[in-house]
Amino acid sequence: MSREKDDENLLRMTKDDLQRWIQAEVERNPHLMQRREQLAQVEEWVKQKERDSTCTRLLYSNACESVLECESVMKGLYALLGLDYRDEDSEEEGGGGQPHDVIQIADDEAERRGNVICNGEDDDNDDLVVIDLGATKETLEPMLEKVTVAIQKSSKLVQDLVQMVSKTSMGATSPLSTSSSDINRPSSSSTPEIVRPESVTPKLEITNSITIVKTESLSSVPKISSLFNSSEQCKSIADHDSYFKPTIKTEPEWTPLTPWEDSESSPFEKLIKTESQSTDVTPSVMTPNKQPELLSFQSTTKIKPEPQSTQANTELSSPPSNSKLLENHNSLSIAAIKNESQLKASVSEVDLLESDSEQSDNAATKTRFKPSEVTASSKLKSSGDHNSASASLNRTDPKVRPVTPSGTPPPSKSPPAVDNTASVETNQTDSELPTETPVEESTLPSNPKEAVIMSDAESTDKTEKPQTRKKSSKPSVTTTSPESRLTSSKSPPVTKTSSTQKETARAQSPSDSIDESADMEDSPDEPSNSPTESPTKTPDKTTRNDAPAKPSKAKKSSKHSSSESSKTLKEIKLKVGAAVLGKKRHNHWSRGTVQEVETEDDGNTYKVEFKKGKTIVLSANHVAAYKPPSLKDLYIGCRVVASAKSENGKSLYNAGVMVELPERKNRMRFLVFFDDGLATYLALPDLYFVCKQTKKVWREIKDESSRKQVKDYLQVYPNPIAVVLRLGQETKAVRNGQFEDCTVLQLDGSLVQICYKNDKQKEWIYKGSDKLEHILTIKNRHKQHSHKKHHSPEGKTQSSQPKTLHSSKSASTSTSSANVSPVSSDSVSPARVTRQSDKTKTSISPQKIMSPAFQPKVVLQKISLPSSISPAARVSNSNTNSSLISAKRPAPDEEEDEYFSEDEVEVLEQEQNKSVYLHQRCCPACLEEVRPHQVDIHHGKNPLLIPLLFKFRRMTARRRIDGKLFFHIFYRSPCGRSLCDMQEVQDYLFETRCDFLFLEMFCMDPFVLVNRARPPSTTTGQPHLYLPDISEGKEVMPVPCVNEVDNTLAPNVTYTKDRVPARGVFINTSSDFMVGCDCTDGCRDRSKCACHKLTIEATSLCTGGPVDVSAGYTHKRLPTSLPTGVYECNPLCRCDPRMCSNRLVQHGMQLRLELFMTQHKGWGIRCKDDVPKGTFVCVFTGKIVNEDKMNEDDTMSGNEYLANLDFIEGVEKLKEGYESEAYCSDTEVESSKKTITMKTGPLLKNSLYKEDSSSGEEPMEVDTAKDKVKVHDKPLGERKLPNKPHETPKDTQKKISELRKNDGQESSGPKRCFAIKSFQRRVKPLESTEAQKEKTKTPKNTRGLFNDEDACYIIDARQEGNLGRYINHSCSPNLFVQNVFVDTHDLRFPWVAFFASKRIKAGTELTWDYNYEVGSVEGKVLLCCCGSLRCTGRLL
């Protein structure tokens, strides 16, 4: 019994309870819980493996680059020797070995091995760092073998090449050590001297594969001076005999590597691993001579071995081919220790500019260098330049960081050797090397022989901050490249460091926190804190020399450099001949070509040639590369140049700031704020990236309103202020300093197009622009709120502070600010801001948001507006001095006007015609990501829900007008476009060629829900009957059958979705007898569609006025019934059936309907989802028979399923002057018709029906003797309706047959024995009864034209039919009947379709008015049980 009880309780569970119970049981399943844990572990393991794989691939890539660098070095050596590089050794060169093919390594195994050698060289090293990246031995061994073979071949080639160099340079008299480096100097002699090394250090021949990796990429090659001139002969070679060999014992530290340049050939830089215990530094002194000659001197490197690897740095410099006589000499290069994991590349590319070589004769610069002492963390570097500063002539790869010691060369017994025309670049230190020590400067050389003798004009620069003058190498510490990989986190700790090194390490470490707000907003980037920095620039802007600075300033300079380095963004390097966009004037950019590149302290400058040969020197932030940038380089706040069309259609270039990246909301476009105040959406090909980016990009904007808008946007990003506007909405906007009334015309993402009412001028503006009244109101109130909250006496001192920000009420231009009174809290003193800066950025409270002042359609999400403070007040208390406060932002491009002569000045369209935003139409690509492979992928779902499943968003908005709250619906497409009405939805579907979504799937009624929960069932148990689909798949949507009342089975009826002609009935469906259209726009233009014209012209038959041009479907819905019928497009039409707006009924039933058993009316139909007004529901089908044959049929059972095709008769009544008397609408009241007063005893005891509950026909036979029925002819208003609708007892219910008056017959004539439902509305006469009788006697000629027929056709749904046969009657129905012509234009056979006459909630029964005439059947009464307030109580 208990089990049966449990089963019974289980059966009584509702669907939701059952789902919850099943979910709970599933959650408690131990196997499921265990499986979830396992899946979580597997997912975490997969993520870890992905991270490991990414790291491994990165190491592989770096190793591959090292191998390629080694190959480029060898090619460079061959090029210097005038030989051709080959993949195998030549027999003439004595190679005799196996071919050494260069293998292109796909995976980067070498870098992983290279990291190991950086941490230690010997096997017994205790400080060896091993990193486990999760890669298995099996996956790494194959790649390791390939890398090892390639590196062995490359190493062999290097050794052979060194030997060959030794053979070919026998003319040198001074032997060189392998650790010495030859620095090529420009010589006045055309004779290049080839210096050969004595021998190759045996340490190069290392068998360990890991060591070979390092040896190949960092092998030592002495620098060879190969300076050839095509028009001069070689000079004799002379060498220097003086040898100075001090022994320097260095500690194991990371010695920064000094970059060097090469010209006209592949650059290279080699570092040799040595293990000698001491370093012998042998400088040489070059004596100036009228006859230029080469000075060679030897240096021996001895370095104490430590866990770090030690390499010798070499330099190579080659002058231009057209330069004058050059002098070469050799200088020593101390071994440098390079960490491979920190230095990404050890080779710098060199580009020698021809224009620079021509300037080599102009500038004469001489720098006196003090002898420097090589310490543990610094390397003595001597870089030779010719008289035009070869450092500025050469370019290094932007990816390679020049690494030099911080500060300047220290005192040493071995000074650098410099020729009489060289400008030696000082050493640099990377701000990211904390172990480097600033070296001090000595005033006198320690040895007279070490004195550096120079000629030409002497120019000594003593700078605290060394600056490198390389063309394309990264600037010194102040301009650190983001690509530099020099980090000290992986370097081994150094235990033996001096106190000076420790202090430098602290000074050079990056700042813990860099406050962007600490810098002045409208002032230029502050220079270095070092007062001794005084770079000297030559007249030709190609050479700038720096001399060592004093050690007392080293720490401060290093710290400042580190701070500046972390702020500097990546700068794009351009080459000569590159096409660019340059800033010619304010808000005007033009195309040009780079003619010359110059390196400055704060970045490169470019000499750009524009049209007509006009040349301007521009900084990097005023030049943009003329090629589309990559998406990964773009970010919010970056500076770009974009092309936009003016009002006259000309393309103009202007700079702007990017504020939106592509996303679904903006339809995958970029939003750019132009400097002239306009905003527009652009695609990637229309953008050009500015070469040099700045943190505070608004400084580049001159216009105050535009600068303020960009600044405010970036400060509150990603939560900017936005205002929600609708199409046609009235608002106010600022123009010329005053508010003007305007109307919203278009919406596009974050932009809105407004039209001013005064002159009808249109303008696209940003939704958060200060031009809008709502935005200004919100910002102004927030400022006032912040001012009151943080009010203090210090705020009164604001009058003495220069005003930098305008009030939120001010106009969009600076010239109009005088028209509006500013708010008193616009600017405050620095002291006040310093103490309250953390309090002013407060979010608006929810109470304030809900206040009436914040109601007008403004959406605020996590808004945190900064208070309006002066830029000078954003520095700390320690920095709020007069110098910082008074610092002003320099006016950019003040000198550019000098390049324009008066006769060349043109009228710039950019200044006269601002860029106009062009609205971009949608295309099929907008739905490409959601377009399904199968059209009916969501078959069986609610049609209104399907767009949401394809990433559309149905959003409800509200607005308060005159104290009343209004709601409206708008859709947001997957590409971000807002669709605010059905017309926009229709246009969007047509523009995107959407063949899987249709117009009837969208609804703008805010009270129609797409996912409304169905009302709970009245029964708790399982239904007595449930069939999943009574249509057996014939309908588009399945039609389930549910019986929760009794055990009545489903009707045994043949289901047919189409009408079936009976024997003897012929329906001509040939297209030859129909009219078709030739529309290609989806039949949206009613005036051109022939089918629409048929529907419109038919309305002329109705009395009361001209034709109704709006007749027919409106956005796939029929708002009201058309007695004259609707003509849909047919197969003869050329329009696309999927996109046509005049095809609806022919597509079949689209709603989710359900057949269910009512309580008292038999079977009925209800909807499972909300149905909007005018929606097509279904058709009424069955067998089409003739009325005459129906009269002959004596076996009339179930005649309540008969319907009359009386379309012709209904229209003829309209033609005769009848007026519609339909009372389907809830607001219509019949003023005069026959009313029924029923006095039946048993009926008074019946219960009350609920309002709008479905009713059905309950025919019964009534004895007129016992139950008196009185019929009164009086107006409806005079009759008192019964308080309670009555229910007929089942024992008295019996279906009866009722007669309906034939058309044209009088009421006293013969009557039928059955009743037929009419699809035409009842009409009332406007004329007298006599006149009506005369007209009714007039014969009907229209039907007689069809073979003299005089009777209507009837749809017999007794044995076969569809859902329409189950729809019950109601005196207040929610459906109306419409005659539709689809497959034939024969007026006798229209399709009978049901449409929703009002909004229908989910779970409501669908009903329609049968149009029975009371008293049409003699002696028989049919009671109405619809339960409506307007229920007449009787059908017949």
From Swiss-Prot:
**Residues where Zn(2+) 1 binds:** 1077, 1079, 1083, 1089
User: Which positions fall inside the MBD domain?
Assistant: 938-1009
The compartments listed are:
Nucleus; Chromosome
Q: Where is this region: Disordered?
A: 170-200, 250-327, 344-570, 781-849, 869-894, 1247-1294
Biased composition (Low complexity) is annotated at 177-190, 474-500, 807-831
The biased composition feature labelled Acidic residues covers 513-525
- Please tell me where this protein is predominantly located: nucleus
Instruction: Look up keyword Transferase and say if it applies.
Output: yes
EC code(s) of this entry:
2.1.1.354
Q: Which organism is it from?
A: Danio rerio (Zebrafish)
Q: Which parts of the sequence belong to the Post-SET domain? A: 1420-1436
Annotated Pre-SET domain ranges read 1075-1148
In this chain, composition skew of type Basic and acidic residues spans 1263-1294
Q: Where does Zn(2+) 2 bind?
A: 1077, 1091, 1129, 1133
Q: Give a yes or no for keyword Nucleus in this entry.
A: yes
**Stretches with biased composition (Polar residues):** 274-327, 374-395, 420-434, 526-537, 795-805, 869-885
Task: Tell me the ranges covered by the Tudor domain, including all copies.
Answer: 633-697, 724-780
- Name this protein carries in UniProt: Histone-lysine N-methyltransferase SETDB1-A
Catalytic reaction equation(s): L-lysyl(4)-[histone H3] + 3 S-adenosyl-L-methionine = N(6),N(6),N(6)-trimethyl-L-lysyl(4)-[histone H3] + 3 S-adenosyl-L-homocysteine + 3 H(+)
**Family statement:** Belongs to the class V-like SAM-binding methyltransferase superfamily. Histone-lysine methyltransferase family. Suvar3-9 subfamily.
Keywords for the protein's UniProt record, in alphabetical order: Chromatin regulator, Chromosome, Metal-binding, Methyltransferase, Nucleus, Repeat, Repressor, S-adenosyl-L-methionine, Transcription, Transcription regulation, Transferase, Zinc
User: Which amino acids does the record list as binding Zn(2+) 3?
Assistant: 1083, 1129, 1135, 1140
Which molecular function terms from Gene Ontology are attached? Answer: DNA binding; histone H3K4 trimethyltransferase activity; histone H3K9 methyltransferase activity; promoter-specific chromatin binding; zinc ion binding
Cellular component GO terms held in the UniProt record: chromosome; nucleus
The SET domain covers: 1151-1411
